[in-house]
Structures are given as structure tokens and as C-alpha cells.
């Protein structure tokens, strides 16, 4: 697994461009004798059929890298075991480890194939960082009548101690909403702002002030909500009043239907109203409804902790504070009962502990076997125990209707 992880880490590919990564994964699965299909734009879905008939489990890993220039060292000089060979692209979130662990789980499952009472699907998902490519996987599953009873996924976590597996009774990762908006006023000479209509001076300043006030005036103080502006672009010369200003950011919450929808409505109302007041025009380049948080099924989480504690030791399995980052895996848990797990990688002696998406990010390779063992154990034990819940909660079409993502609904179902 360590060898595989190092290959993935040295050869990261950006979201939506993971062509060589998919080729490599396909070759590895072929070498193992595992049947699989490459889903165009979606990733890979592999199938391991057990020695007995039964239910089905889907195990998932994401595969894409990030536009980050990796530093030669992690938090401790000389401790990196490998580094990206692709300038400006890095596995800075642990997806290299996720792939390696799922391949490791595949080998464990093959070794125990005769005792598997059902089917295990391995899903290697492209484009998780943009949450876009998974939209090709679910329609494939439905159109091919693939029956799944439960899902399991793992994310390496830099804030948890190395080797600690966390499965919460509920929230694991927040839901997200992204926004990117252009404000158009009227440009002019920097010496005569009275003859121009700067999108900066009044319009954006007022929008930003309103944005800061939303948390105080519209968000329940007992609900989690965080947001920030990460993009602000306008003008390129000091004596020219620009015509346009573009700003963008993100909002995160565990209360999508309450806080999330409120934020969506209130920010748009503020932008529209303030632009009208200052005679500016707003263009919503990106403004989608917020996604759902990654929330474990409580019954499944308690069952999973029990069986995985027997495999890994009770001292190594428990719960951990939720993470405000977001994950496309929420879409799996909306459709099927299951769990999402954190596997800690923090190791001060090895210089490992930098935040995800940071240029000094690194993972503790010595924990990969635990992630593989946990995934394989979840699948094997679930298929042994018919008393544990399973089955589809909703179709993908129903999920899209639930999140009001009509663009994707039309794309895949022609409505």
C-alpha cells in the first residue's frame, strides 16, 4: 500500500483530469483479477462477488489532486518520503492514501472471498474536490440496476492522532455552498469618481458589511455556520476606476435546510437590493443551492464502531469533533444508510500535521493498513449480519429534487 500511495503522491492529477490515475487503478484491478468498469467522467466501479449470495456494500475512495505547489519538506525538514513530480499539483488532502487503502482493502477481500456473503463494490471517484464527477456515477448505478445496501468511506484527518479511527453518531463534515458574483458599475478616471460608478466604493462595501452581519442577524446562535470571501478581483491600475468587481467565497453548515437555505436567500436578497440601490448590475457566475453535510446514520455508526473496535482495538476507535470542510460523500449517505470515518494521521515526530490543502501537508503511511482493514472488515461483517439495516433510502433523481439541482436533473433524466 505504501508503494501505491507514493506512486499516487508523485503523480497527482487535477480534478476532472485524472486520466493516468484511472489508467493506473484499472491496471491494478486487472492484475488482481477484479472485474471493473471505467465510468466516463465518473471514475471506476469494481465488483468483488463473494462465495455466497447476499446483500451488497459499496466502499468508496476519491482520486483527484489539488492546485497546490508542494514544499520539499513537511513540518519537519528531511521527513517527506515522496514529493509531487507535477509542478503546481499536489495530493494535499490525502486522496493518494484513500486510493492506496481501497486497493489494500480489495486484496484483503480477495483473500477472504469465500467467506463473503454477498457483493462488494469498490468505487474510485473522480473530481471530488469540485463534487461534480460523482454525478456520472449514480446514474450509471441506477441505469444498470446495481443494488447497494450500505456505503462506507474513509478520510484521512490531520487533526486526529495517527491511527485513530473516528465514526461519529451524526455529523462528520459540513455541507457547502459556493458563490461567485460579478458587480458591474461604470468605469472612469480615478480623479473623477463623481463621473463614474465604482462597484468597489459603495456597492461592494455595503454588500460585504451585510455579509458580515448575516451571522449576527439571521443565523441561530446554536447552529453552526461559517463563511468567508476568498476571491476579490477588480481593476489593475490605481488611476482607473474599474467597471466590474468579482467576489467569491464559501459557506459551511451542518444545518442545510435551515441555516444553509437562509444564507442562500439572504445573500441574494442583499446583493440584489444593494446593487439596485447603487445602480449596479449583479451577475451570478456561480450560485448553487447549498449541499448537505456528511451525516452518519446513528445506528450504523454504533454498529460500525463495535465491529471495527474488535478488529483495531477499542482504544483506537471512537468519535471525533466534526470537520467544517465538505465532501461529495454526503450524496452517498443521502441515498443509502452507511458511515463515513476519519483516520488520524497526525504524527509530530514525522513532521505530519499540516492542515489539509496546505503545501506542507503529509500523511503517516504507517496507518494505511488500518484504513484498509477497517473498510474490508466493515464489508465482511455487514454481509454476515442481516439484522443491520440496508437498502436504498432514495433514488438519485429524488436526491436531486431534494437539493433543487434542476440542472443536473435535466442533464441526466431529460426533464
Regions found by a protein language model. Give the residues of each.
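Acidic/His- and Gly-rich active-site-bordering loop/insert found
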Residues: 1-91, 96, 100-117
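Divalent metal-coordination and catalytic microenvironments
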Residues: 8, 29, 46, 59, ...
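Short, flexible, mixed-charge acidic loops at enzyme active sites
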Residues: 68-80, 170-174, 348-355
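Soluble non-cytosolic domains of exported or imported proteins
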Residues: 15-20, 96, 198, 295-298, ...
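Histidine/acidic-residue-rich, glycine-tolerant segments that coordinate divalent metal ions
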Residues: 66, 80-90, 96-97, 109-231, ...
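Active-site beta-loop-alpha junctions enriched in small/polar residues
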Residues: 13, 62-64, 127, 157, ...
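Metal-dependent amide/peptide-bond hydrolase catalytic core
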Residues: 202-415
